[in-house]
């Protein structure tokens, strides 16, 4: 009897659920900003009178189950609330307009967590995709110049395809990395393939590019700049210098949409060095301090450069329904640098597919491929840089003669050699010889594959898992003809480098958001891992002396094959091959408590385990972050002309990870198979750098959100800097590492903006940014009476 009753009760319950389900159907659509004609991220969509609802995704899309008689309520901070009856519709698209009585925007913060801007306890600035696309560049990040206080972007002088140096609030590390972390859709990306920084002064270190140049600007929906350590603390050691959060576009449900864009920009040198034009060439044919010229020498530098241009072409397709959405884009870039024969080409393919599984589970897959081809990219130093010869060309000499006849035949060598005022010196040479006989060629491929799954367990609780794999490949060939670099390579040089980089990243996040009467709680906890691998294969050979066949050097000049380099491995090198692997495991948590939407308290914590510290006393390091903000306008009647009057403060301690192979002995294999012992002592007590950051600020908007003002004061101290110093003679080693030093940055940032909406189709906005940073080295290594000398090939810097 009990079984029959149970079966009957289950049957009735099933019929009830089925009947209830039959009364609802899937409703989807897109919510956009009517004024900007852009999707709204994080807009709330609720069934009126219930707690059932959802939020729009990165492209303004939403999907939920609703009945025919239900009313959907669309709300978004700073927008007027809209109510739409379902009435049997399956697609409801909404255009929202500004509400001058409210304020705020949704900001994508660390780990991809979305928050209302007015709740943040630190400085964060958002830039729309349109701002990046107004004036496109080969490197997308260059389009952000001047758009944020406290951010300095310096494109390298290596020409088209080169990287850019990005600084938030000054240099913090003397020996380590100062670049901010780049994050795409919540996941950190590899900054460059070669893992090199362009800082060589003499040896001509090349530019390995960066991840920003592989991003199609038309794929960008939003960029958030997290300039302080507190803002990026959840990313841990890799984000001690801040983070650039890039949110890309996804597919929208509905009919297929196609977007096509093409633009061309031109550039030319704005400022050139001033040259003396009174004295001619010196006796050695190198400098310009010889006899006084009878007439003023012309400015040859102006004749060297050309007008550069960059053309960007892009097409994207998106579409789908409530169950599956897809987005595809293709872009190509062709650029001619201002240096002759410096050309850049790239192709970018990007695809994203999203699936709504059941009611509460969403899955995304992404795939991306980028190919870059660069010719005649100048080196960072002056050894292989044609600009050195342009700027130091002896005054009064025949520029056109060296341009048209950059090489002459040398019967002794049986080949053409460089024609220059002094072919024996190494500092600089004929720039046209370099452009035609020392051509560096770079080919890069970058592959990215990723996926994520999110389960909305309840309207307040969700769990999300993400994973991304990246692979970078680079092939760099630089063959120099005989007589290059003066007497350094009289018979030429062959160089063939291949770099490979792999990064695997994964994380799991659990998020909870709930409002309890006057209180609100937003919390996220999770774990992540990052595994990187970099390898390098270098084949090179040099003709460093005039040789006869069989002498152990080059056989025929200007034939760049390994077989042309004779005998021993000192002339054909394979010993510059290496591989590094690194792993970083982390756990983290963050929580924000709000009171009456006017007081907010933040706390974050993270612990990292780095394989670079595996041989030290502890490979683990912990750091916290705290913050608070008060919106006085929520508690004090300030009149209709004050929309937001907010004060904020935050404090954090964030680590900066160290390079590999510092805590253990590193043996290398020589070209003859011999094992080479290390020349540096293992650093068993190595500690990561720690950045202590304090930030205090004010945010205000006035006159119905027309006027906005932001002011921030900050102070950072980065301690535990790591240095290489001379080891005691009796140790048998050359150097040892030490933790020491304190680098301080303090300053303020100020920005003011005005926005005016004249009509539905015409608006005007302007912004002014100003920042000041005082960068000082407060402490260095103790017990070094002669100071600390940091050396690079051909350069030394003494710091006291």
Where are the regions a protein language model picked out?
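Short, small/polar-rich motifs associated with maturation and membrane association
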Residues: 2-9, 15-350, 355-358, 362-364, ...
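Structured core elements
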Residues: 107, 126, 152, 167, ...
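Short small-residue beta-strand/loop micro-motif enriched in glycine and branched aliphatics
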Residues: 191, 327, 335-338, 488, ...
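Extracellular/periplasmic, surface-exposed regions of secreted and cell-surface proteins
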Residues: 179, 290, 308-311, 346-347, ...
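Acidic, glycine-rich flexible loop segments
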Residues: 310-311, 382-433, 437
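Low-complexity intrinsically disordered tracts that form flexible linkers/tails across taxa
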Residues: 193, 374-393, 780-784
């Amino acid at each position: 009897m009990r079984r029959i009753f149970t079966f009957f009760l289950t049957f009735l319950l099933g019929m009830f659920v089925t009947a209830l389900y039959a009364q609802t159907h899937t409703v989807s659509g897109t919510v956009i900003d009517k004024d900007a004609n852009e999707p709204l991220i994080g807009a709330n969509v609720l069934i009126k009178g219930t707690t059932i609802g959802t939020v729009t995704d990165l492209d303004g899309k939403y999907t939920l189950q609703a009945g025919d008689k239900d009313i959907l309520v669309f709300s978004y901070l700073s927008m007027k609330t809209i109510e739409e009856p379902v009435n049997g519709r399956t697609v409801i698209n909404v255009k929202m307009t500004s509400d001058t009585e409210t304020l705020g925007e949704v900001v994508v913060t660390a780990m991809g967590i979305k928050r209302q801007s007015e709740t943040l306890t630190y400085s964060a600035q958002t830039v729309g995709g349109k701002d990046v696309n107004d004036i496109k560049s080969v490197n997308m990040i260059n389009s952000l110049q001047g758009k944020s206080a406290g951010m300095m972007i310096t494109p390298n002088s290596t020409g088209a395809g080169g990287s850019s140096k990005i600084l938030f609030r000054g240099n913090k590390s003397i020996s380590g990395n100062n670049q901010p972390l780049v994050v795409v859709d919540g996941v950190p990306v590899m900054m460059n393939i070669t893992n090199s920084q362009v800082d060589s002064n003499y040896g001509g270190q090349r530019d390995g590019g960066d991840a920003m140049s592989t991003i199609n600007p038309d794929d960008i929906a939003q960029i958030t700049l997290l300039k302080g350590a507190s803002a990026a603390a959840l990313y841990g050691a890799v984000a001690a210098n801040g983070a650039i959060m890039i949110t890309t576009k996804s597919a929208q449900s509905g009919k297929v949409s196609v977007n096509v864009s093409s633009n061309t920009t031109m550039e030319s040198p704005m400022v050139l060095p001033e040259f003396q034009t009174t004295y001619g060439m010196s006796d050695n044919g190198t400098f310009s301090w010889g006899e006084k010229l009878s007439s003023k020498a012309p400015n040859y530098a102006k004749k060297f450069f050309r007008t550069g241009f960059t053309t960007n072409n892009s097409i994207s397709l998106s579409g789908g329904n409530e169950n599956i959405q897809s987005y595809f884009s293709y872009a190509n870039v062709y650029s001619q640098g201002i240096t002759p024969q410096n050309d850049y080409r790239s192709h970018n393919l990007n695809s994203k597919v999203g699936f709504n599984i059941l009611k509460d589970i969403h899955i995304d897959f992404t795939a991306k491929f980028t190919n870059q081809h660069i010719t005649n990219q100048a080196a960072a130093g002056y050894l292989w840089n044609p600009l050195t010869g342009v700027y130091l060309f002896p005054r009064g000499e025949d520029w056109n003669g060296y341009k048209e006849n950059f090489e002459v035949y040398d019967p002794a060598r049986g080949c053409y050699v460089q024609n220059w005022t002094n072919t024996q010196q190494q500092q600089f040479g004929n720039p046209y010889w370099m452009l035609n006989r020392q051509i560096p060629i770079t080919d890069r491929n970058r592959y990215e594959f990723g996926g994520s799954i999110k389960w909305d367990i309840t309207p307040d609780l969700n769990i999300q898992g993400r994973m991304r794999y990246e692979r970078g490949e680079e092939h760099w060939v630089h063959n120099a003809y005989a007589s290059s670099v003066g007497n350094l390579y009289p018979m030429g040089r062959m160089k063939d480098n291949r770099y490979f980089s792999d990064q695997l990243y994964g994380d799991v996040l659990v998020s909870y958001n709930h409002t309890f009467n006057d209180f609100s709680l937003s919390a996220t906890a999770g774990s992540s891992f990052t595994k990187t691998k970099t390898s390098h294969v270098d084949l090179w050979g040099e003709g460093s002396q005039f040789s006869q066949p069989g002498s152990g050097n080059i056989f025929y000049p200007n034939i760049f094959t390994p077989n042309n380099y004779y005998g021993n491995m000192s002339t054909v090198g394979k010993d510059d091959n290496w591989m590094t692997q690194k792993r970083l495991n982390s756990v983290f948590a963050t929580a924000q408590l709000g009171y009456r939407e006017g007081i907010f308290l933040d706390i974050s914590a993270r612990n990292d385990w780095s394989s670079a510290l595996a041989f030290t006393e502890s490979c683990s390091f912990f750091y916290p972050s705290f913050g608070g903000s008060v919106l006085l306008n929520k508690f004090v009647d300030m009149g209709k002309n004050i929309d937001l009057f907010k004060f904020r403060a935050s404090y954090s301690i964030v680590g900066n990870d160290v390079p590999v192979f510092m805590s253990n002995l590193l043996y290398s294999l020589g070209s003859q198979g011999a094992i080479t012992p290390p020349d540096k002592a293992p650093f068993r007590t190595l500690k990561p750098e720690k950045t202590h950051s304090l930030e205090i600020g004010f945010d205000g908007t006035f006159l119905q959100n027309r006027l906005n003002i932001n002011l921030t004061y900050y102070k950072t101290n980065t301690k535990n800097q790591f240095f290489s110093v001379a080891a005691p003679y009796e140790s048998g080693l050359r150097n040892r590492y030490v933790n020491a030093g304190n680098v301080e940055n303090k300053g303020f940032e100020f920005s003011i903006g005005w926005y005016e909406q004249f009509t539905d189709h015409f608006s005007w906005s302007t912004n002014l940014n100003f920042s000041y940073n005082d960068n000082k080295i407060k402490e260095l290594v103790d017990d070094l009476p002669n100071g600390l000398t940091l050396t690079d090939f051909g350069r030394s810097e003494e710091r006291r």
